Amino acid sequence: MAATAPKAGGSAPEAAASAEAPLQYSLLLQYLVGDKRQPRLLEPGSLGGIPSPAKSEEQKMIERAMESCAFKAALACVGGFVLGGAFGVFTAGIDTNVGFDPKDPYRTPTAREVLKDMGQRGMSYAKNFAIVGAMFSCTECLVESYRGKSDWKNSVISGCITGGAIGFRAGLKAGVIGCGGFAAFSAAIDYYLR
């Protein structure tokens, strides 16, 4: 941006102001996008949003509690329990062998027997889903806290740890397969959701 020469008959202050305008513009650019740019705290009120007061100590304490690994694990445990129970009841509902007595195959099961089997299967699925959800969520939170990053590697590492821990109950080979399978599943879900 070259400064234009002052017109004939123009005053000296006008010529100086026109020469300084590009200079002020370039200084402004340095503060906005250049080397002198600094991080700014953007308040919602300055952006046209609703201004919010500063957070109280109670609000900060509640936020810290809700961001803790224990809370995340408990939330995943409860969510897994509910989802697992619903999944167990659903699968028991479509299973044709619910309430089936192998001693008397021609007898029709009563509603009480069918509901009892559905409840048992729902509770079994609920417990398993709750344990897996709590283990995965807690492990992912701990890995994220240790690494200091929130990326796809956290879910893969925690998936491997969770799958390996579940699989090691059946032996070393099952633990390695569980580690790889759960890590691959976690990576696929993380890739699909992000």
Swiss-Prot record:
Judging by the UniProt lineage, the source's domain of life is: Eukaryota
What is the protein's membrane topology class? Multi-pass membrane protein
Q: Which Pfam families match?
A: Tim17
Q: Which residues cross the membrane?
A: 74-94, 123-143, 170-190
Which Cys pairs are S-S linked? C69-C141, C160-C179
> What does UniProt give as GO cellular component?
TIM22 mitochondrial import inner membrane insertion complex
Q: What is the annotated localization of this protein?
A: Mitochondrion inner membrane
Q: Which family does it belong to?
A: Belongs to the Tim17/Tim22/Tim23 family.
- What do we know about how this protein assembles, alone or with others? Component of the TIM22 complex, whose core is composed of TIMM22, associated with peripheral protein FXC1/TIMM10B and the 70 kDa heterohexamer. In most cases, the 70 kDa complex is composed of TIMM9 and TIMM10 (TIMM10A or TIMM10B). A small fraction of the 70 kDa complex is composed of TIMM8 (TIMM8A/DDP1 or TIMM8B/DDP2) and TIMM13. The TIM22 complex also contains AGK and TIMM29. Interacts directly with TIMM9, TIMM10A and FXC1/TIMM10B. Interacts (when oxidized) with TIMM29; interaction is direct.
What this chain does, per the entry, is described as: Essential core component of the TIM22 complex, a complex that mediates the import and insertion of multi-pass transmembrane proteins into the mitochondrial inner membrane. In the TIM22 complex, it constitutes the voltage-activated and signal-gated channel. Forms a twin-pore translocase that uses the membrane potential as external driving force in 2 voltage-dependent steps.
Q: What is this protein called?
A: Mitochondrial import inner membrane translocase subunit Tim22
This protein's species is: Bos taurus
Encoding gene (name) = TIMM22
